[in-house]
Curated annotation (Swiss-Prot):
Encoding gene (name): OR2D2
Bilayer disposition of the protein: Multi-pass membrane protein
Protein localization: Cell membrane
Function of the protein: Odorant receptor.
Cytoplasmic side: 50-57, 121-139, 220-236, 291-308
The protein, known as: Olfactory receptor 2D2
Extracellular side: 1-25, 80-100, 159-195, 260-270
Sugar attachment sites: 5
Amino acid sequence: MRQINQTQVTEFLLLGLSDGPHTEQLLFIVLLGVYLVTVLGNLLLISLVHVDSQLHTPMYFFLCNLSLADLCFSTNIVPQALVHLLSRKKVIAFTLCAARLLFFLIFGCTQCALLAVMSYDRYVAICNPLRYPNIMTWKVCVQLATGSWTSGILVSVVDTTFILRLPYRGSNSIAHFFCEAPALLILASTDTHASEMAIFLMGVVILLIPVFLILVSYGRIIVTVVKMKSTVGSLKAFSTCGSHLMVVILFYGSAIITYMTPKSSKQQEKSVSVFYAIVTPMLNPLIYSLRNKDVKAALRKVATRNFP
């Protein structure tokens, strides 16, 4: 037994969302439906922005980047979870687990940065409308989007390195449905304080700093909107920002609970992870499309053109 414990783990057993066969069948149907809506919703949003010239603006450029990150974020997790719901042996190789952890963090961290960039875009559009075209040029937009993806990659590489450098020689059972940092740290065969501190500091960089920037941006927006004499202008400004604010609250709220708060129960961690890893990517395109007149107009235009 001592020799077994000293052997490096080569695969992990994912305990999943449930161990009941009937519950797993129901979860498979629900997750499959959610994933299909996520894929179709985000692809539709990206396609609409691509084909409709009225949507060729900085706001929709960033929205396309967010939809792409959402799509990749969900695709990295859900298909594997669906396969495991139908499998008796829910095993994942160490290398594959490491790869999925890295991509999960990349797409998640990129979303954090993009949401902060989108709040800055709304701030400039509402607080400096006359200077907006000169400030948010396409060159600046590409730089901001590239910076978001780059920061997401850098933070993710640091987090993943600190997690994977730990020895895993004991239990290989992960009390989760995918390879997530907090669930993996529990299995490490050594002190994880340094790794936890590194993840916390990266969380400050990619979670708390963007949240602070978003709050500052929306604080300035609210002050500007309150000063507006036109009721129509105020309502339009709040409507434009409302969708983004809803997405920010949903994603950041659940992510901060997972990575920036004291450890909670395993069941609570899984529930929060389901929300921000599976549900939020599905809700984002729905929130932006259902609350956005431009997107709905583009959808009607495409529908009329193809189904007269």
